[in-house]
Amino acid sequence: MGVTSENVAEKYGITRDQQDAMAIRSHSRAAAAQASGRFKDEIVPVPTKVKDADGELHEVVIDQDDGIRPSISMASLAKLPAVFKKGGSTTPGNASQVSDGAAA
């Protein structure tokens, strides 16, 4: 998917700044939607156990998209390197997550 992003950006003249700005808008909108409960019917709460720093197990419920980054900025995105093509413009901050998906 990252290489395709690079190819599309090159073909249509989409700059790194444009990609970063869109990433900020997307995460901001997603954060607002999640905060207002718009995703509640799309995310099934999953109880699980996690270990804390001391190795203690705690039960938690995963009920939100953890990929939303509401605090990203142009400055923070500018620090990330292109990862799919040398001299490219697609970074971990403006690309789609590779961890998306679920199984039932």
Residue ranges and their predicted role:
Residues 18-104:
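N-terminal extracellular/periplasmic Venus flytrap/periplasmic-binding protein-like
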Residues 1-24:
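Conserved thiamine diphosphate
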